[in-house]
Amino acid sequence: ESLNISLLDGRYNKKGEEKADQYKVSLAEPNAEYDFIILSVAGGKIKDAITTLSQNHITGSLILFCNFWNSREEIDEIVGAYPYVIGFPTAGGKLVGNELDCVLFDHIMLESEEKAGISNYKALTALLASADLKMEIPHDMVEWIWLHMAINAGVTSSAAREGKIEHPAQLALNLMKDAHALSTTVKVIRETIQVVKARGVDLGFYKNELLPYRIPATFAGILMKRMFKTNELTRRIMTLHSDVGDMLYGCKCVYETGKLKHLELPIFYSNIEVLGSIWESSPL
């Protein structure tokens, strides 16, 4: 079996280069041993993936490329005996049948060697460099993922503010061309990042990530509209991100923690509560 790949490649050009290729899928055999196993699954499914690997006695250093709302201790427990490192791909796409439409930026988020639980970290960084991928190492990868999820929850809930999320690509297009809606999204993100702060995260370590949401919301909305219009990489990844279950998982994690910690997040809560029955049946 093979995948037909359409890739907007952002490694060598800020505008991205359109590429096409075919990837032959070779399924892993039981008892196989690998240097690295990239684990990239939808929210809440890490445990099931680890179980599948373990039952088939497939071994190797895990690279976690997933959204999760767990603590590091919980991830340790879920992963069990597997050595692992936490990262995050600045990439995304949509798989329909055997057609993969995707976007790749020029870097990968990766945990520092000190915090990584693998013995072949240097081999991993060499592998990434050989693929012309830079590495960005945040203060703490777990906290960075929480922050990323909170920001995404702000964006998703704003895009779906009219209670419809069945056609996420169209919602993304509508949001990206509406400066007023984008300025409201910035206000929602300011609310959702308070949930991460309430979990004990020092936001001072993530100033670069949060800078776009510090400037006046009206101005930020205008800037974001212009950025989406001119930056095809960012625009494409927004429209390709279409896993509704994964989007709602992130929203639900942020919403429930906000309620648990009695935080005042009026716009975010209002956006979420409009989703109604779709929201009630979403995974967590």
What are these regions (language model features)?
Residues K15-D101:
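Rossmann-like NAD(P)(H) cofactor-binding subdomain of soluble oxidoreductases
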Residues E1-E17:
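Glycine-rich phosphate-binding loop and adjoining beta1-alpha1-beta2 segment
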Residues E77, A81-P83, C102-L203:
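Internal alpha-helical scaffold of NAD(P)-dependent oxidoreductase catalytic cores
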